[in-house]
Amino acid sequence: MKSPYPEEFNRQAIGLTASLHFAPTQKAADALLKEGKDPEQIFVTGNTGIDALHYTVRNDFYHPETEWAKGSRLIAVTAHRRENLGEPMRYMFRAIRRIVEEFTDVKVIYPVHLNPQVRKIADEEFGGCDRIHLIEPLDVVEFHNLMKASYLIMTDSGGIQEEAPALGKPVLVMRDTTERPEGVEAGTLKLAGTKMEDIYRECRQLLTEPEIYRRMSEARNPYGDGTASIKIRKILENIDA
């Protein structure tokens, strides 16, 4: 229940009162069965977050930051988890800076979390590097289009692990564990950990080995095909009928 917190706490608390469970994957449905949920109340639909990309991602989207990154290999970064605060986050950021300093065609855009501790570390570790832009948090439309414009994603966030693969973007997860094991198994995600050398090595591999990049970017997203909301609506209509 504590890992990841508060997401797992919220999931279990809501699950106690829910009469229907719409699971994004079969593995998630199996987990609900192990918790004792009624199998007749569990439906595998995919994740509605993938559906949203059909409405938020646009070919004509304009943002000055993505314009700045045109012609480069853009890495979108997010980092904010409380378990990474302190030294783990510093190591993560140092690995990213090392990549930028080594590869002159790489630029980084990092919408920095509002947590003052995160901002302090980001300023200290990324300061003075003109190919790393620290920007204010983006809204969902802006961020989805940032992901689309990116070459790869480096994150410790949860939902991004499901959304980015739907856009064909490899995801390096800067954590030691993930609650999205389906993505790792499918090959859309790779756990890079929180050690500087490990993160640097995994990122460098994606930048220098086209076949590995291709396999990750073309892997099938296990979290749905963008039709979860349609499936849920049909289920609800049949229940109400």
Give the label of every model feature segment:
Residues 1-110, 115-241:
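Nucleotide-activated sugar donor-binding and catalytic core shared by glycosyltransferases
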